């Protein structure tokens, strides 16, 4: 048996034509294909006991335990910047960042780092991060860019220069 994200896949090394069943019925919704042994619909990181019984004059049964693979951790955090945000991956690195909803203000996202640039301040962006491991998952986080400081001022002319009013 080869583990998968929601169960496992069987490889028959003995006689073909037998029947696969769970040795103990799972309570997580997993199902097994009786002819191929493919387990689907289960939970990650769960152990299943599977029996394979051959048919014929002298049937035999083999019981194998298999533990499904754990889903990738796609968690990340966004820190706002003036024109977007920066991402910090807290889960599995090496995935891909995209905008969950495409912005209309010219903002772009670096697919490797999650850095958003070229956006407007005080704008909310929805960012998606998808892992590329054995059991890919996606997390979506929103970030609102920082409101830019007001740097405007006025100058009043005087005889020896000027006076600034902020």
Predicted feature locations:
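Short, exposed coil/turn segments at beta-strand boundaries within extracellular/luminal domains
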Residues: 54-61, 132-138, 159
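Proline-enriched interdomain boundary motifs that mark the N-terminal boundary
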Residues: 1-3, 70-80, 146-155
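Short beta-strand/loop motifs in extracellular/secreted proteins, especially
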Residues: 16-20, 48, 93-96, 125
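Append "Rare intracellular matches occur via the same short Y/T/C beta-strand/loop motifs
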Residues: 45-56, 122-133
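A short beta-strand segment in extracellular, disulfide-stabilized domains
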Residues: 6-14, 83-92, 162-166
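Low-complexity "stalk/linker" and mucin-like segments enriched in Ser/Thr/Pro/Ala/Gly
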Residues: 19-36, 96-113
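Short beta-strand edge segments in extracellular beta-sheet folds
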Residues: 63-69, 140-148
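Extracellular/luminal low-complexity segments enriched in Ser/Thr/Pro
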Residues: 37-46, 113-122
């Amino acid at each position: 048996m080869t583990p998968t994200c929601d169960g496992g896949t069987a490889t028959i090394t003995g006689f073909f034509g037998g029947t696969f069943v769970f040795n103990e019925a799972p309570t997580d919704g997993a199902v097994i294909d009786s002819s191929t042994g493919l387990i689907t619909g289960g939970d990650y990181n769960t152990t299943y006991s599977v029996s394979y019984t051959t048919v014929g004059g002298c049937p035999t049964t083999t019981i194998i335990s298999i533990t499904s693979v754990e889903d990738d951790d796609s968690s990340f955090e966004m820190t706002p910047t003036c024109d977007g945000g920066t991402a910090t991956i807290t889960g599995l690195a090496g995935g891909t960042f995209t905008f969950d909803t495409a912005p209309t203000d010219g903002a772009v996202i670096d697919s490797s780092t999650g850095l958003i640039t070229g956006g407007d301040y005080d704008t909310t962006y929805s960012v998606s991060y998808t892992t590329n491991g054995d059991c890919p998952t996606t997390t979506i986080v929103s970030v609102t860019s920082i409101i830019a400081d007001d740097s405007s001022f006025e100058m009043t002319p005087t005889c020896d220069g000027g006076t600034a009013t902020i």
